UniProtKB/Swiss-Prot annotation:
Signal peptide: none annotated. It comes from Pseudomonas fluorescens (strain SBW25). Catalyzes the transfer of a ribosyl phosphate group from 5-phosphoribose 1-diphosphate to orotate, leading to the formation of orotidine monophosphate (OMP). This is Orotate phosphoribosyltransferase. The lineage of its organism: Bacteria, Pseudomonadati, Pseudomonadota, Gammaproteobacteria, Pseudomonadales. Orotate binds at F34, F35, T128, R157.
């Protein structure tokens, strides 16, 4: 585990974004942990979050021309990542996002920001069912000269859907692009193992990983 990944897990726990206990997911599964990126909800938290996304991009080695933030949650994530890449890595890259509803006046269309062209890196919080990412792939496919280079999310739950694969593995298979994350559940497990105060949650998270993991 890289230092930035350990720092990210600590940061997510401190912000209440990553919690341990008993949570019922939309899938109906009872999970021993819950990740809610909506709680990165202050200026300082968003700035820090952008730095973690930027570090993961640099680490991944994915080459791309433009960042894309899917509406709604991906918009501040793409903005914060673009700022962090410029300020901390000397990479001043264009970014854009989509509107859920196309505007009939003003700029018009459903895309805002830089032109969506070249290799596109999609920034989002998590991939649960993969539905949102599939919609994004249609948006990218509709733009001349644009193609997806990859997807970056905060946490890979490494969890099976209804079949044998996770939603992330299905996206990778169907679109032939990498999906990378700041951290994965395996790294969260490693963090719990090393933390005396949180180690009590390790058996439940490990059992969940064994039952539903990929």
């Amino acid at each position: 585990m890289q230092a930035y990944q350990r720092d990210f897990i600590r940061f997510a726990i401190d912000r209440g974004v990553l919690r341990f206990g008993e949570f019922t997911l939309k899938s109906g599964r009872t999970s021993p942990y819950f990740f809610n990126a909506g709680l990165f909800n202050s200026g300082s938290a968003l700035a820090q979050l952008g730095r973690f996304y930027a570090a993961a991009i640099v680490e991944s080695g994915i080459s791309f021309d433009v960042l894309f933030g899917p509406a709604y949650k991906g918009i501040p994530l793409a903005a914060a990542t673009a700022v962090a890449l410029a300020e901390h890595h000397g990479q001043d890259l264009p970014w854009c996002f989509n509107r859920k509803e196309a505007k009939a006046h003003g700029e018009g269309g459903s895309l805002v920001g830089a032109p969506l062209t070249g290799d596109v890196l999609i920034i989002d919080d998590v991939i649960t069912a993969g539905t949102a990412i599939r919609e994004v792939m249609q948006i990218i496919a509709s733009q001349d000269g644009a193609k997806a280079a990859g997807v970056l999310i905060a946490l890979n739950r490494q969890e099976r859907g209804n079949g044998e694969l996770s939603a992330i593995q299905e996206v990778e298979r169907d679109f032939g692009i990498p999906v990378v994350s700041i951290v994965s559940l395996n790294q969260v497990l490693q963090f719990l193992e090393d933390d005396p105060q949180l180690k009590q949650h390790l058996p439940a998270v490990r059992a969940y990983r064994e039952q539903f993991g990929v």
